[in-house]
Design a protein with these regions (language model features):
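Hydrophobic transmembrane alpha-helices that form the pore/transport pathway of multi-pass ion
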Residues: 59-99, 108-125, 167-172
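Core transmembrane alpha-helical segments of multi-pass membrane transporters/permeases
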Residues: 1-26, 43-51, 55
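Short helix-coil transition sites and intra-membrane helix breaks within transmembrane domains
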Residues: 5-6, 19-26, 56-68, 98-107
Length: 193
């Protein structure tokens, strides 16, 4: 139970903040008006929400707090703009939040992972970033396609997988051309041991 206390406190504070934003500040109505008045097409909402969630979570170091802040805002906005995009926009919120938390140097999970594995904190962040960025770019493309096709799963999944494959092929070709196969690091590590 002691291990769950920080998560419970974050959730209670996030729910409190979301209640204040929803009831006292009318944040969903304000954001909805800003989105519609700004002329942002509804199809780009999931991709935009993904980027906002990633930035907010990266900046704060908490995915749970980002869930609590953004979900009460983006669900009513998605419902007002295009009800078929509610699920996709919610998924974009969750994915962006987890990506931001995973890559944030101030995230508690990142700090604990580096401490638990016995490696330098900044080194841990820098080694996680390329892998997370590959998936984030693929997700972003998938959310753009999903928004354009109205939340359909297969086209967005296909676009995300195709993007990931293209990025992996590009990285492979670059590593082959530069002669970096990763073998040198393995040789250095075995020589140091």
């Amino acid at each position: 139970m002691k291990n769950m206390m920080p998560a419970n406190v974050i959730l209670v504070l996030a729910w409190t903040l979301s209640g204040v934003c929803r009831d006292l500040l009318s944040t969903p109505a304000f954001v909805q008006h800003a989105v519609t008045a700004g002329g942002i097409p509804a199809g780009f909402l999931p991709a935009i929400v993904f980027v906002i969630a990633a930035f907010l979570s990266f900046s704060t170091g908490t995915a749970w707090g980002t869930f609590g802040i953004l979900i009460p805002i983006v669900v009513p906005v998605a419902q007002a703009l295009d009800p078929t995009l509610i699920t996709v926009t919610l998924a974009a919120t969750l994915a962006g939040s987890v990506f931001g938390d995973h890559t944030s140097p101030i995230s508690d999970t990142t700090i604990l992972s580096s401490a638990g594995s016995g490696c330098s904190h900044i080194e841990h962040v820098s080694t996680q970033l390329p892998y997370a960025m590959l998936v984030a770019v693929s997700c972003f493309v998938g959310y753009v396609v999903s928004g354009i096709v109205g939340g359909s799963f297969l086209p967005s999944f296909g676009a995300a997988v195709a993007t990931l494959i293209v990025l992996l092929v590009i990285l492979h070709v670059r590593s082959v051309r530069s002669g970096d196969t990763g073998g040198e690091k393995e040789e250095e590590n075995s020589a140091a041991a």
